[in-house]
Curated annotation (Swiss-Prot):
Keywords: Membrane, NAD, NADP, Organellar chromatophore, Plastid, Plastoquinone, Quinone, Thylakoid, Translocase, Transmembrane, Transmembrane helix, Transport
Catalysed transformations (reactions): a plastoquinone + NADH + (n+1) H(+)(in) = a plastoquinol + NAD(+) + n H(+)(out); a plastoquinone + NADPH + (n+1) H(+)(in) = a plastoquinol + NADP(+) + n H(+)(out)
Protein name: NAD(P)H-quinone oxidoreductase subunit 4L, organellar chromatophore
Lineage of producing organism: Eukaryota, Sar, Rhizaria, Cercozoa, Imbricatea
Keyword Nucleus in record: no
Broadest EC class assigned to this enzyme: translocase
SUBUNIT field: NDH is composed of at least 16 different subunits, 5 of which are encoded in the nucleus.
Topology relative to the membrane: Multi-pass membrane protein
Gene: ndhE
Length: 103
């Protein structure tokens, strides 16, 4: 039993839409970072699906997916470090209360 390409693309589209919804509607900075990670995981699903179905013998999609995972890990580490610093200074992670021009 094989899963068709459309199923993977639908799953990735749903995950990406959930990530965009969370990015737009969330005021919490940690939730915004989680939404960005969800969107990057949807991109990874697309890369893996297209790599498997378009050219199964070459590993181009897997290489790009590893690259995206690496960038996502670096983004998460830097983002959480910035959020931790802001939390120590402001005592909140509410995005609307962040105004870096005014201390």
């Amino acid at each position: 039993m094989t899963i068709m390409l459309e199923a993977y693309l639908t799953l990735a589209a749903v995950l990406f839409c959930i990530g965009v919804w969370g990015l737009i509607n969330s005021r919490n900075a940690v939730r915004v970072l989680m939404s960005i990670e969800l969107m990057l995981n949807a991109v990874n699903i697309n890369l893996m699906a297209f790599s498997n179905y378009l050219d199964g013998e070459l590993i181009r999609g897997q290489v790009f997916a590893i690259f995206v995972i690496t960038v996502a890990a670096a983004e998460a580490a830097v983002g959480l470090a910035i959020l931790l610093s802001l939390y120590r200074n402001r005592q909140t992670v509410d995005m609307e209360r962040f105004n870096l021009l005014r201390w």
